[in-house]
């Protein structure tokens, strides 16, 4: 008789989380929100032909995602230890540079766009840092199971469970590496448990996948432990991460729900309006097909070639000459006029929905930049973006949470001290070491500096620099140094020209720019 397999305690807690998510209808609502954003807005409706879609949800989401994500964030570590002096300043400067390097290495700008967009669509999104290199993975809200679904602060959770689908061979390899017995490894088999997977759950046929859980919890001493489990096998036993006191995760919630750790996105509230706009469009097209074009009407037995009625340029032959007018045998029904009310209602529905969502034409940037200055465009944009100030503030908090998690990970994975490469002005790389006790002694805090970065902001900055140069208020060299690195003007090319000039004798110098005694810019 085969031995009955029992679920692990981790899987049982996961099942309780699934029950909660199902009660909240989280899986279906999230899937529905993503379908409408992606344009699959007639899901479940069967028709002989393609049905029309007027997708105003996607530009609304993309605009709001851009307005939040274009806030250029910079992590700044500071010390709360007044006695730290120059040494504390050096350590904080090294950590700031180290954070900048990791931000670029992990492509956090791109990652943040994805997190913000997912949160805008589904209400909340999560990022998980899973190794000493701070490699990150974006986690769907439906794959996160919290011990307390009313507690918004992840760091106050008793435990957190992350769900994922993994190839069976990879799981077995990890189980063998962790010293599991052969009979336990053989219990790891493919399954079809995709009921909680949102999006395309079609898997490539092969050795199969199985559902896996990452279980994170904090012991009484405040230290984080991890374990991994399938439904019946814990293939990575409980493992403490020495020195790690924070869950290596951060969450971004779009619109917080009252008394809930979850959030509400932009999509679900406007889906009824999107459906009605699509229905109106479909009805108008059907009406146009039925009534907007003239239809031939004829006496069939008096037409010699009825098959040619629909052919362009073909003559229609009649079988009799006893009629007074050919219109008695063959004529057209005039097109019926279409009421404009349906079109007006549809346009008004779409425009009102976009305006109420804060994503009208002005907000979406549908302004001719040739007819307005950069400052004017920015003023209009900033006024339209006022409703997003809460999301921008929460995005700053999200980046701050990431920065605090990074500090904890650095301390945990570098118990002997953190060595940071720092490039000096002369190009020589200096290795600075931060002792492990320094993290506690300095009592580090995080400040996030945010500044918007978008085409119109760049245009306004460069426009101001060009005016100052033209007015002689700055030199050309100062203009080049003041240009941002991502300016549309070729900063590096200008810098190379200046270096070439510096190497030439004074007599061979070309004419100076407007800020250097007149002439052209170069």
List each language-model region with its residue ranges.
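Catalytic nucleotidyl-transfer cores of nucleotide-processing enzymes
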Residues: 223-313, 479
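Broad gene-expression machinery/nucleic-acid interaction feature
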Residues: 124-126, 141, 211-212, 236, ...
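Generic detection of long, well-ordered alpha-helical segments
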Residues: 85-92, 105-109, 266-274, 278, ...
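C-terminal anchoring/interaction modules
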Residues: 1-30, 34-36, 45, 127, ...
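Extended, helix-rich architectural segments
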Residues: 1-225, 229-231, 308, 337, ...
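Intrinsically disordered, low-complexity segments enriched in proline/serine/threonine
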Residues: 54, 61, 84, 169, ...
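Helix N-terminus capping/helix-initiation residues
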Residues: 55, 140, 166-168, 265, ...
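Generic signal for short, ordered secondary-structure residues
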Residues: 77-82, 95-99, 106, 256, ...
